[in-house]
C-alpha cells in the first residue's frame, strides 16, 4: 500500500470515528500517524532524479516573498507591476511553469519576490503544484493572490494545501519546551490548565514517533495538532498577506468587505489601484527594521540602510556588516528609540529598533 492510500485510509477512519471522550486518544494517535505520512509524501522520491526547473532559485536580498495562488489569478501581472521583472502573462491557465524571481526595492531594502506556478486542488498530495507549495516554505512572507470573484473558495483551498505541507499561516509556534533525553522516561508539566492535552495523549503521540524519554513543559492551552507540530519539528510559521485581484469584476460593496478583512489588500493591476499600499503592507508584514551606521566623529550615513529582522541584537547587526565583527566588538553606541539616552553604550545583546543609528567600536 502506497503512502497516499495509507493517508486516505486514516482520513476515512477519522471521519468514521465519532468524537467523544472515549475516542479522543485514538483520534490523537491517528493524527500523529497522518502527520508522519504527509511528511513522507513531501520527501523527494529519488535522490538522483532531476530537480524541477526554476524551483531552486537562490535566495537573495533582505527577504523573500512568495506569490501563491491558483492559475490565472494575476500573480505574473502583479510581479511585473511592482518589480522590473517581466513575467509571462496570458488569459489562460498555467502561463507560469517555473518560479520567476523579481526584486522589489522599498526604502533602501531589496525584497525578492518569487512568482510560483499556479497550484491546483490536491497539490500537497502530488496532483500538480506540489513543488510550488513546498517552495513557499522558503519564504519570509506568503502573498496569497486570490481572484476577488472566487475569493472565499480559493482562500479556503489554498490554506488547506499549505497546512498539509507544514506551513502555518499567521500563527506563532506553540509555547512548549520539548527536551529529548537518553533516559528517564516521559516527564509532563504544564503552567496553565489544559483542555485538549494530557499526559496520556502526549505519551501516545511521542511513542508513535519512537520518543520514549523526554521532558515536556507546556505554557499555553495547546491542541493535539499543536503538539504534533512541535514533535515533527519541521513546521514553518509564516506571515501571510491576502491580496485580492480583479476587483473591477465585483461590486463596490464586495470590494469594501474584502478590504476590511484582516491582513487583506484589494488591488487592480489594470487600474494600478492600491499597488503602493500593497508594497507598504508587504514591508510591515516582513517585520524588518532599517538601521543606519555612523563612524566615530562623523555624521550618520542615511543613504544606505542596514536591513535587519525585528528583534535583532547588536550581535546580529555586526554579523550583517561582517561575519567576524561581533568577535572584535568592544562596545556599540546607539542613538534612537531603543536607547535610554543618546548615545547609549551597549553590548552584543542590546535589541535595536527601527531607525536606530549605530556606531561599532572594536577592541
UniProtKB/Swiss-Prot annotation:
GO biological process: cytoplasmic translation
All copies of domain TGS, residue ranges: 287-362
Sequence ranges assigned to domain OBG-type G in this UniProt record: 63-287
Residue positions binding GTP: 69-76, 115-119, 246-249
Positions of disulphide bridges: none
Sample GO molecular function, one term: GTP binding
Keywords assigned by UniProt, alphabetized: GTP-binding, Nucleotide-binding
Family: Belongs to the TRAFAC class OBG-HflX-like GTPase superfamily. OBG GTPase family.
Gene3D superfamilies in the cross-refs: 3.10.20.30, 6.10.140.1070
UniProt protein name: GTP-binding protein 1
Transmembrane segments: none
InterPro entries linked: Beta-grasp_dom_sf (IPR012675), DRG (IPR045001), G_OBG (IPR031167), GTP-bd (IPR006073), GTP-binding_2 (IPR031662), GTP1-OBG_CS (IPR006074), P-loop_NTPase (IPR027417), Small_GTP-bd (IPR005225)
One of the record's GO cellular component terms: cytoplasm
Amino acid at each position: 500500500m502506497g503512502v497516499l492510500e495509507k493517508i486516505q485510509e486514516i482520513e476515512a477512519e477519522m471521519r468514521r470515528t465519532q468524537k467523544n471522550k472515549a475516542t479522543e486518544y485514538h483520534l490523537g494517535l491517528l493524527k500523529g500517524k497522518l502527520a508522519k505520512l504527509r511528511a513522507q509524501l513531501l520527501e523527494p522520491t529519488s535522490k538522483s532524479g532531476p530537480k524541477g526547473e526554476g524551483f531552486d532559485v537562490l535566495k537573495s536580498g533582505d527577504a523573500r516573498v512568495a506569490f501563491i495562488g491558483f492559475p490565472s489569478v494575476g500573480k505574473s501581472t502583479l510581479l511585473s507591476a511592482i518589480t522590473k521583472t517581466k513575467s509571462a502573462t496570458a488569459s489562460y491557465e498555467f502561463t507560469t511553469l517555473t518560479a520567476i524571481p523579481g526584486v522589489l526595492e522599498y526604502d533602501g531594502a531589496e525584497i525578492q519576490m518569487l512568482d510560483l506556478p499556479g497550484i491546483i486542488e490536491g497539490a500537497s498530495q502530488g496532483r500538480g503544484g506540489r513543488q510550488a507549495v513546498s517552495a513557499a516554505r522558503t519564504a519570509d512572507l506568503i502573498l496569497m493572490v486570490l481572484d476577488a470573484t472566487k475569493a472565499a473558495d480559493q482562500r479556503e483551498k489554498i490554506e488547506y494545501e499549505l497546512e498539509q505541507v507544514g506551513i502555518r499561516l499567521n500563527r506563532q509556534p506553540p509555547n512548549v519546551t520539548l527536551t529529548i533525553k537518553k533516559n528517564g522516561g516521559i516527564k509532563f508539566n504544564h503552567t496553565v490548565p489544559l483542555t485538549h492535552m494530557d499526559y496520556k495523549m502526549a505519551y501516545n503521540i511521542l511513542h508513535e514517533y519512537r520518543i520514549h524519554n523526554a521532558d515536556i513543559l507546556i505554557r499555553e492551552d495547546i491542541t493535539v495538532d499543536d503538539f504534533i507540530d512541535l514533535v515533527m519539528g519541521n513546521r514553518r510559521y509564516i506571515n501571510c498577506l491576502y491580496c485580492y485581484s480583479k476587483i473591477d469584476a465585483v461590486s463596490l460593496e464586495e470590494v469594501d468587505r474584502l478590504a476590511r478583512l484582516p491582513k487583506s489588500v484589494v488591488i487592480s493591476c489594470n487600474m494600478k489601484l492600491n499597488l503602493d499600499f500593497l508594497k507598504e503592507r508587504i514591508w510591515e508584514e516582513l517585520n524588518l527594521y532599517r538601521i543606519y551606521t555612523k563612524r566615530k566623529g562623523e555624521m550618520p550615513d542615511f543613504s544606505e540602510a542596514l536591513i535587519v529582522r525585528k528583534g535583532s541584537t547588536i550581535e546580529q547587526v555586526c554579523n550583517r556588516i561582517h561575519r567576524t565583527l561581533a568577535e572584535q566588538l568592544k562596545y556599540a553606541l546607539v542613538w534612537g528609540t531603543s536607547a535610554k539616552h543618546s548615545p547609549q553604550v551597549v553590548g552584543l545583546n542590546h535589541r535595536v529598533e527601527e531607525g536606530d543609528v549605530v556606531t561599532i567600536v572594536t577592541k
